[in-house]
Structures are given as structure tokens and as C-alpha cells.
């Protein structure tokens, strides 16, 4: 476990070497930290600025062990890395921030809103839907317009559709691939 705050010269591990990982690596380097990136892509953008690059799947045990050996603390560049990998790093004794629970909750919009409400944080009204029929019913209950979002792996507006009328919900559900969704009332 790392003694926080970290001292310059220590290594920050990052799961993910995309553009966000690159920006985080550059900022860490300016503050005097080394960065170790774990990413499945050999030419990940963050690898160009990180002190260490580990090319492995996010849940590859040897890759995780290599990252744990290098890093005083580990984070992740986005919420779509496997929560189990973050849990494995924590089990190895590596300080991981945010932790596995935060990542798991953030990976599912329904779980996220339910968690927030359970802990006293208000959200817009919402309803889950696993079928086109359930989506139509959810919009009828919440009122239109409503924002339909995939429960997992959406980002930067991807995986979202505005539903202007309950009758449009089945079409929007199909456009999003038929995966489980959450509908949010317009604020």
C-alpha cells in the first residue's frame, strides 16, 4: 500500500492508455511522477509519454502483476475496464483509487442511480427496461421526452437516444442494440 500523498519519483499505474491516459500521464510527469500504463494495444497513445508500458489485456494476471510491481498507486482512465481487474490489484495490496466498488457502480447506469439514491443523492426520475415493451411502459410512466441510455459502456453521448413519445421507445431500444437500458425523465 502506498503512503499518500505520493512523493515525486513514485510510479502511478494507469489501466488504459488512450487519450485520457495520455493526458493523465503528461500531467503526472510534469509533477515529477513516473507512470506505468497497462493497455492491450501496443501503440496506445499514453505509451508515448509513460515511463513504462505493459501490453496486456486489462484482466491478464501477468500484466496486472507487472503493474502492481511497478506502481505505488493505480487508477484507470475510464470506467470500461473490468472491475474484476481492479479488485485483483487491490487484493495484491496495491492502493487503487477509485476502488473496485466505485468502478463497479459506475459501470452500470441503473446501479449508479440506485446507489446514489440509496445514499441520499438525488437524481432525475428513472426506470430500467430490458425489452422494447418495458421501454414503452417506462416512457409512459416517466413522461416524454425521456432520455434512453444503454446501461453499460456508453460515453460522450454514445448509447443515448431522446424519446419524444412513448410510441418511439421501441424503435429507440432497437437502435441501441436491444441491450438493457435506463430511461431518465427530462429534468
Predicted regions and their residues:
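CheY-like receiver
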Residues: 66-67, 115, 138, 171-175
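Glycine-rich beta-alpha junction loops
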Residues: 42, 152-154, 187
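ATP-binding N-terminal substructure of ATP-dependent carboxylate-amine bond-forming enzymes
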Residues: 1-107, 111, 133
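Short secondary-structure boundary segments
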Residues: 78-79, 150-151, 185
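Short catalytic-loop micro-motif centered on adjacent basic/acidic residues
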Residues: 73-76, 98, 124-125, 182-185
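Conserved ATP-binding module of the ATP-grasp superfamily
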Residues: 122-124, 145-148, 159-187
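Glycine-/Pro-rich loop/turn segments that contact NAD(P) or position catalytic residues
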Residues: 104-145, 160-163
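Acidic/polar active-site rim loop that often engages polyanionic ligands
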Residues: 94-96, 115-121, 149-157
Amino acid at each position: 500500500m502506498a503512503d499518500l500523498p505520493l512523493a515525486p519519483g513514485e510510479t502511478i499505474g494507469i489501466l488504459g492508455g488512450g487519450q485520457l491516459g495520455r493526458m493523465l500521464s503528461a500531467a503526472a510527469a510534469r509533477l515529477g511522477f513516473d507512470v506505468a500504463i497497462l493497455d492491450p494495444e501496443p501503440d496506445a497513445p499514453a505509451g508515448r509519454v509513460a515511463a513504462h508500458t505493459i501490453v496486456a489485456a486489462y484482466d491478464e494476471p501477468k500484466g496486472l502483476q507487472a503493474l502492481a510491481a511497478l506502481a505505488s498507486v493505480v487508477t484507470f482512465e475510464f470506467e470500461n475496464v473490468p472491475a474484476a481487474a481492479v479488485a485483483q490489484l487491490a487484493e495484491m495490496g496495491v492502493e487503487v483509487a477509485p476502488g473496485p466498488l466505485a468502478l463497479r457502480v459506475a459501470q452500470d447506469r441503473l446501479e449508479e442511480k440506485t446507489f446514489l439514491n440509496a445514499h441520499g443523492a438525488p437524481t432525475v426520475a428513472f426506470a430500467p427496461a430490458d425489452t422494447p415493451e418495458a421501454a414503452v411502459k417506462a416512457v409512459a410512466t416517466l413522461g416524454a421526452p425521456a432520455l434512453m441510455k444503454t446501461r453499460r459502456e456508453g460515453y460522450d453521448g454514445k448509447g443515448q437516444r431522446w424519446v419524444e413519445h412513448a410510441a418511439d421507445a421501441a424503435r429507440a431500444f432497437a437502435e441501441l442494440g436491444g441491450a438493457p437500458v435506463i430511461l431518465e425523465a427530462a429534468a
